[in-house]
Amino acid sequence: MLKECIKIEGRAFLGGKVTRVKLGSGECKTLQLSNKYLILPGMVDIHVHFRDWGLSHKETLRGGAAAALAGGVVAVGDMPNTKPHIRTADLYKKRLEEGSALPIIYKVHMGIPQDLEELRAARPPTIKIYPEDVEAFGWGHIEKAAEACASLGCRLVLHCEDPAYFKEGERPPIAELACVERTRQMAFKTGVKIHLTHITLSQTAEAARGWATVDATPHHLLLDVENCKDSGLCHVNPRLRTPEMRKRLLAAFASGLVDIYATDHAPHTLEEKRSGAPPPGICSLDVALSLLLTLWKRGVVTLSDVVRLYSHRPARFFDLQIDVKKGYFTVVRLEEFTVRGEEFAGTCKHTPFEGFKAFGRVFATSVGGRIYFKDGDVYMINI
């Protein structure tokens, strides 16, 4: 972090209104802002993959945190498909302890264990279910986990694709729709809270109303099989859809049917992505806020939508208080720029958004009143 504290003054936008924001004491250095800057609550990304452990060649906790700070993100929810997979209370607690050293707020979704007593020992607020878990354990075990989760007051986060519909490497849209219906029945039977992550279909957003929350990613909102044809960089699960499907999802997103915006930031090495069998995953955490602000600039969403989708609702998801006045904020310069992966702050330096004209470049990020990112530089000297 910067050694001196920072006070922000000046006419700047806060939640769509021109205002003056002061943080810090009179001795603090003052950061003067003009109307060319936007002050927003810090962003919260509930779906990231910070890898590390046996996958540190792809990404590390430190690298992931750097990408978050560069993207205006002050809190994240990390996924459990690490190496080893986080399926035990001991691994869950170990990961949380390691993440506590980061300058951002760090949460972890626990993986589903074979022995459900591990859930009672860990008492995680969220459990992540993958299609591979359905293949490994069966829907019966998933339902037992849902019952245990309901009794503990936690939430199931599902990558909702039914593997029964996977065929010859293809994952058709029907796999998502079938999983949604099966999950709906499970939710009503067990009473468990459900969140469907990285949905790709407007029908999913509509079907989830009343019993589940949903999120959508920047790549499923902006990229499709026609405008993203790089077989490596564009390879992701769930798959990118047709332009028509993408546009319908974007319309659902703009209408308020989608609760949360989340990246599914999933780094792999460029060599892996350029191989004959590229692993699925897209890097976008550094620029996800800018991509969302681009939709605001285009008139697709409002500024209130931006804050609701990427700060307020995901903060509520983790029961966090993310408030500008408490020092959790990001400062955005209102300018257009070209996305360049080589400029990313995290370990991952490649993205299918390469060359994309985005709007709103993150200038500074504060966590708890401390500036950890400013004008292209990340400050993490204490870890």
Swiss-Prot record:
SS bond list: none
GO MF annotations, alphabetized: allantoinase activity; dihydroorotase activity; zinc ion binding
Entry cofactors: Zn(2+)
GO cellular component: a single term: cytoplasm
Pathway listed: Pyrimidine metabolism; UMP biosynthesis via de novo pathway; (S)-dihydroorotate from bicarbonate: step 3/3
Reaction(s) catalysed by this chain's protein: (S)-dihydroorotate + H2O = N-carbamoyl-L-aspartate + H(+)
GO terms under biological process: 'de novo' UMP biosynthetic process; purine nucleobase catabolic process
Keyword DNA damage among record annotations: no
Positions with a binding annotation for substrate: H49, F50, R51, N81, H268, P280, G281
Parts forming coiled coils: none
Binding site for Zn(2+) 2: K128, H159, H198
Record note on cofactor: Binds 2 Zn(2+) ions per subunit.
Record SUPFAM superfamilies: Composite domain of metallo-dependent hydrolases, Metallo-dependent hydrolases
Active site: D264
Pfam family name, one: Amidohydro_1
Keyword field: Hydrolase, Metal-binding, Pyrimidine biosynthesis, Zinc
Modified residues (N6-carboxylysine): K128
EC number(s) per entry: 3.5.2.3
Binding sites annotated in the UniProt record for Zn(2+) 1: H47, H49, K128, D264
Function: Catalyzes the reversible cyclization of carbamoyl aspartate to dihydroorotate.
Sequence similarity: Belongs to the metallo-dependent hydrolases superfamily. DHOase family. Class I DHOase subfamily.
Name of the protein in question: Dihydroorotase
Lineage, highest ranks first: Archaea, Thermoproteota, Thermoprotei, Thermoproteales, Thermoproteaceae
